[in-house]
Curated annotation (Swiss-Prot):
Keywords: Chloroplast, Membrane, Photosynthesis, Plastid, Thylakoid, Transmembrane, Transmembrane helix. Pfam families: Ycf4. It is found in: Plastid, Chloroplast thylakoid membrane. Signal peptide: none annotated. Belongs to the Ycf4 family. This is Photosystem I assembly protein Ycf4. Seems to be required for the assembly of the photosystem I complex. It comes from the Eukaryota. GO terms for biological process: photosynthesis. InterPro entries: PSI_Ycf4_assembly (IPR003359). It comes from Chloranthus spicatus. It is a multi-pass membrane protein.
Amino acid sequence: MNWRSERIWIELITGSRKTSNFCWACILFLGSLGFLLVGTSSYLGKNLISLLPSQQILFFPQGIVMSFYGIAGLFISSYLWCTISWNVGSGYDRFDRKEGIVCIFRWGFPGINRRIFLRFLMRDIQSIRMEVKEGLYSRRVLYMEIRGQGAIPLTRTDDNLTPREIEQKAAELAYFLRVPIELK
């Protein structure tokens, strides 16, 4: 959801609470739990999972490896669930022509830098830069060039915007900010 008037443009950024992250977290949790149960059942010699008899899997080396993969998968799954619950990466971009200020806010991981808040003067914005890489792993990212600060990404690398969408977004933002567009 975005909001725009003549003087203010607010763009909300979705963070890690995306459908793909929920799917990967569920798949990883269930798969690693299955691996851990198979490894544990081979150690105990009892069938904890009725689909697979534990006598067919020896604890050394298959059971140990499956238990290791199960534990590693549970750690990665818990990391994904934590990023989803903390909504890491979400926030907003606010461009205020009336005040002449650009504010970029993102939520980070818990700790000292949980809230990432950047503020710039509009007169310090040099350009809007589009970076387009085509090929097997195509990537289209929009950057804001700040004098003395470098480039700040405005879109995520996994947004998968079409060339037309990224061009339109860059043109609208450059027109709103009254800065040129660079293509890299």
